């Protein structure tokens, strides 16, 4: 067990000031706290607490640190620093020691520390998580929960020896253990819907509490007399229950943690942002505390911003899904919204398919004479085959839904592909027969065939437990004859880099699978069924993406926007010359647009009839309407700045939405999007296609894959397990022109510090899912009011959606942005279905997406919507307090996890319904995100020098927020679109015969052995 010094504990936390303690609180020097000083925080969101055995002190967690405060209240003393990331303290029986969970090294482990914060010692190690520790009454044992057994179970640790014993071992998720007063029993939650009690002597378990339907249970705790207390949450209600009696007040926001008992008739628990003493006869007293939390203003660094006026020719780096021909002489890929064919040795590629639709994922037939690919030219993504010599096209599928990511079998008789639900199908080209190869998978990778055509392999996620969704991206093999599924880690506790184009890919001779792990290429020897026959071997040590075999013994890959090849022995790496360039498209003309009214994005009221004078795609002047005829007569409309959705993921379902997506955003007046995470080469390709004018859609700022920790969930998150790998991720970001960097849920604080420093040196802002210590280490923003968190709950909103002083004050004081992504805004469809029924929505939504949207709107008519609206009101209240306090709120939706385009308007309407003025709401979707992007004055406003990104609407959006969606015309960079023009490609479709037009229904039988198999759309937040 490694002991860490107190200086280690507090280093970097802004709480070590020459070891000086002032008024019982850890002091913070001006140099350490920065110019912002310290905020005196007296409320905490989702804090947990534990009373010392003598009843004199309370230990609690706040801003992911452990603090103590006298039971009478007063100044809180901080015991741990930022990098320890410690929560959920529990006292030893002698009152000298605390145990807590801490995320110091990328997994949750148990630590002890003395009551003064010294003597920090790590008790558990390894790749599994260890959480929720509680000392036994005799102090000899610590009970905790862990996923070390394949699901969450209750374990005990012998304090003297460190030996760990599993106490429960079932498929259920067992957590939050609590000791009986005599130390002979443990109570714990089961799947959050029940509480069981284990007799440690006999091993017998008994069910003591079962939650009502729709309720969850948290934090069991035994009273001195053995009565069980716990927290019950149902809908918009959270209650503290003792025995069979609710002891909390109506409307109280009880946090989901175990109470501590002061006596048989009094306990301490956390609720409403406070530490509360509560007697069972109903008396409540707040234990007031003041915690000095360091606050720093956002770092002042030189921002890298896009030159929105540039017409300079640029090298294409957005080379999406490259694949080599069987003879190794050609490469097919997508770039600039077209499919291309490169003959190796001739750097100038030939453009194959460029009809304006979304054409993607080419693959060669075995003879190399044709490619198959996916295209939405007939409405949805279908499979097509193109003869490379003649250009003749053949439609292979005309099925409902999307058919994407095709891969031909080695003999050319079959195609494996993925549908919109994550099911892999096999199409027999001779008969047209379709066979379902896999159940529904969560965002799987592109399949690859064994040489004998009997097995498929692909990347798929396997979580560590049901309780927390993260896991590793593994090699999934599918025996096509038996349907047997087999998961194999590429290396112990490692992930395939992304579940897209990073493998696995089978070598032509069947000897190897190749894949990318930690941004480098590896090969592993396999048998005919894809079973590993030896350890994986590293092939490259530079940034490596998008693997394809180039003949039998070489690999094709992308290195920071350059095609390269290398031998499987790691030798002979060299560039494959490719000459492909583009110029940003710019409007070159002068226009005068006359409007009936104008909101300039700044003033709180409309201007009257105005002329917007445009020159070369920018606003030259805004003048009172003149007498000369305008170029564009929009006198029946109101002009406003184009809206900005600051949290989207273009390519989370990009293959399914295809060309519809950009058109939909424009049709709803959204002229700029920001993505905090997308598959990097899909992002780069779409960004360049939009800039070049080869694709229709809004501006696209963003980043590649988010930098994650040791575990992942989404297919576009990168596991990062070493500093060396972190440097590779940052090198990719610099080379491929990211606009920002997002760090994701499992990245530890020490790594996050490194990313912040490197990103700011490169001029890039950052965002994450965390407020603290992100605020203190220089992060620029936070996504969501409180979504997926490695804790399993948020420290910015409670389970009832409420935020307290810690969250609001730190946002206001620090200047960090918050992007709310109000998923509960679907509640507004209880009295307003105009967005659902709008022609733009009905035309541009894929049919299956529209059906889900209608179902969501229908749910707003049910009694359950009362809970949705209560949570929504709480979320908006938080955001409004931040906004009116001077904080930095930028609108974003998490589309397509929430519905593209329409969800931004639903968010705006929800803000207004629960307290924002229309002006305030619109500011969060125009001027504010423009400032975050570094384009204040260029985007989000109508003023001289701004880009001509304009939306022309019917009505007054400052009086009726619904008018912001009543778009008739939209302009991006001076290029004018009518709504009819945007809808036209998907309003009607030519009838094109297809090889197969009917498919058997997919079987979604849920196999408990693979409980995590589910469609991506079943999860509605990026969290």
Q: Predicted regions span which residues?
A:
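A flexible loop/linker signature enriched in serine peptidases of the S9 family
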Residues: 42, 57-67, 82-86, 99-111, ...
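Active-site microenvironment of metallo-dependent hydrolases
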Residues: 3, 287, 292, 306, ...
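N-terminal export signals
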Residues: 2, 8-29
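Short loop/turn segments that connect beta-strands within beta-propeller blades
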Residues: 70-74, 114-118, 158-162, 200-203, ...
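Divalent metal-dependent hydrolysis catalytic cores, especially in the metallo-beta-lactamase
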Residues: 661-681, 698-705, 735-747, 756, ...
């Amino acid at each position: 067990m490694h002991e860490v010094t107190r200086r280690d504990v507090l280093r970097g936390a802004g709480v070590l000031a020459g070891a000086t303690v002032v008024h019982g609180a850890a002091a913070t020097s001006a140099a350490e706290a920065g110019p912002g000083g310290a905020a005196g925080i007296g409320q905490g969101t989702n804090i947990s607490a534990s009373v010392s055995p003598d009843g004199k002190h309370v230990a609690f967690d706040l801003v992911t640190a452990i603090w103590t405060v006298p039971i009478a209240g007063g100044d809180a003393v901080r015991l741990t620093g930022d990098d320890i990331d410690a929560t959920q303290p529990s006292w030893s029986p002698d009152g000298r020691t605390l145990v807590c969970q801490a995320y110091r090294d990328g997994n949750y482990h148990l630590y002890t520390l003395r009551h003064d914060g010294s003597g920090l010692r790590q008790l558990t190690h390894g790749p599994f998580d260890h959480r929720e520790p509680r000392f036994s009454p005799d102090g000899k044992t610590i009970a905790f929960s862990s996923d070390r057994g394949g699901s969450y179970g209750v374990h005990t640790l012998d304090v003297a020896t460190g030996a760990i014993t599993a106490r429960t071992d079932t498929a259920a998720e067992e957590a939050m253990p609590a000791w009986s007063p005599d130390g002979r029993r443990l109570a714990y939650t089961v799947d959050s819907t029940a509480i069981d009690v284990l007799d440690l002597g006999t091993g017998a378990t008994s069910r003591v509490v079962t939650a009502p339907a729709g309720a969850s249970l948290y934090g069991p705790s035994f009273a001195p007399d053995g009565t069980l207390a716990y927290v019950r949450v149902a809908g918009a209600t959270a209650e503290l229950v003792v025995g069979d009696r609710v002891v909390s007040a109506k409307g109280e926001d009880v946090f989901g943690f175990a109470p501590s008992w002061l006596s048989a008739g009094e306990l301490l628990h956390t609720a409403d942002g406070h530490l509360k003493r509560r007697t069972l006869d109903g008396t409540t007293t707040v234990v007031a505390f003041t915690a000095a939390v360091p606050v720093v203003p956002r770092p002042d660094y030189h921002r890298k911003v896009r030159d929105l006026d540039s017409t300079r020719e640029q090298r294409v780096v957005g080379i999406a899904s490259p694949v080599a021909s069987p003879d190794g002489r050609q490469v097919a890929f997508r770039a600039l919204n077209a499919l291309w064919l490169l003959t190796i040795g001739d750097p100038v590629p030939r453009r194959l398919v460029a009809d304006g639709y979304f054409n993607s994922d080419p693959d060669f037939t075995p003879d190399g004479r044709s490619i198959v690919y996916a295209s939405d030219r007939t409405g949805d993504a279908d499979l097509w085959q193109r003869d490379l010599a003649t250009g003749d096209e053949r439609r292979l599928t005309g099925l409902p839904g999307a058919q994407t990511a095709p891969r031909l079998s080695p003999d050319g008789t079959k195609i494996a592909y993925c549908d919109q639900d994550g099911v892999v199908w096999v199409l027999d080209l001779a008969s047209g027969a379709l066979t379902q190869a896999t159940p529904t998978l969560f965002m799987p990778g592109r399949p690859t065939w064994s040489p004998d055509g009997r097995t498929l392999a692909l990347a798929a996620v396997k979580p560590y437990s049901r309780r927390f969704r993260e896991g590793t991206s593994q090699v999934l093999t599918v025996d096509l004859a038996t349907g047997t599924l087999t998961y194999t880690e590429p290396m112990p506790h490692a992930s395939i880099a992304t579940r897209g184009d990073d493998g696995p890919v089978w070598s032509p001779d069947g000897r190897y699978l190749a894949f990318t792990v930690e941004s480098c290429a590896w090969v592993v020897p396999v048998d005919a069924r894809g079973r590993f026959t030896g350890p994986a071997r590293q092939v490259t040590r530079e940034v490596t993406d998008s693997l394809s075999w180039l003949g039998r013994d070489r690999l094709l890959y992308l290195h920071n926007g350059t095609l390269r090849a290398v031998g499987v022995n790691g030798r002979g790496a060299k560039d494959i010359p490719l000459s492909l360039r583009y110029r940003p498209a710019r409007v070159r003309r002068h226009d005068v647009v006359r409007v009936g009214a104008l909101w300039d994005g700044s003033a709180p009221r409309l201007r009257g009839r105005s002329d917007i004078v445009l020159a070369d795609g920018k606003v030259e002047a805004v003048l009172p309407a003149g007498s000369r005829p305008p170029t564009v007569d929009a006198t029946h409309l109101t002009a406003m700045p184009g809206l900005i959705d600051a949290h989207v993921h273009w390519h989370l379902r990009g293959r399914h939405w295809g060309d519809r997506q950009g058109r939909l955003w424009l049709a709803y007046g959204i002229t700029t999007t920001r993505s905090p995470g997308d598959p990097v080469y899909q992002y780069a390709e779409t960004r360049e296609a939009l800039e070049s004018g080869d694709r229709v859609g809004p501006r696209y700022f963003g980043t590649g894959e988010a930098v994650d920790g040791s575990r992942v969930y989404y297919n576009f998150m990168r596991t990062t397990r070493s500093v060396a790998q972190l440097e590779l991720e940052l090198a990719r970001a610099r080379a491929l022109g990211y606009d920002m960097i997002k760090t994701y849920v499992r990245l530890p604080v020490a790594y996050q510090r490194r990313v912040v420093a490197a990103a700011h040196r490169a001029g890039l802002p950052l965002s994450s899912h965390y407020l603290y210590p992100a605020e203190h280490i220089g992060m620029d923003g936070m996504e969501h009011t409180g979504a997926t968190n490695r804790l399993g709950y948020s420290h910015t909103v409670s389970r009832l959606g409420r935020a307290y002083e810690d969250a609001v004050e730190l946002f206001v004081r620090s200047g960090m942005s918050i992007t709310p992504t109000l998923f509960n805004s679907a509640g507004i469809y209880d009295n307003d279905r105009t967005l659902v029924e709008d022609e733009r929505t009905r035309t541009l939504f894929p049919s299956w997406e529209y059906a889900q949207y209608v179902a969501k709107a229908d749910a707003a008519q049910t009694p359950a919507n009362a809970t949705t609206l209560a949570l929504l009101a709480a979320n908006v209240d938080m955001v409004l307090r931040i906004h009116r306090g001077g904080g930095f709120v930028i609108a974003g939706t998490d589309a397509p996890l929430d519905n593209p385009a329409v969800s931004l308007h639903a968010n705006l309407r929800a803000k207004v319904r629960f307290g924002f003025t229309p002006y305030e709401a619109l500011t969060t979707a125009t001027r504010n995100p423009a400032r975050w992007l570094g384009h204040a004055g260029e985007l989000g406003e109508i003023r001289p020098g701004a880009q001509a990104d304009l939306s022309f609407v019917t009505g007054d959006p400052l009086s009726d927020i619904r008018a912001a969606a009543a778009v008739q015309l939209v302009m991006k960079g001076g290029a004018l679109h009518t709504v009819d023009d945007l809808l036209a490609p998907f309003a009607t479709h030519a009838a094109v015969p297809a090889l197969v037009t009917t498919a058997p229904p997919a079987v979604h039988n849920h196999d408990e052995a693979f409980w995590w198999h589910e469609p991506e759309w079943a999860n509605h937040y990026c969290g």
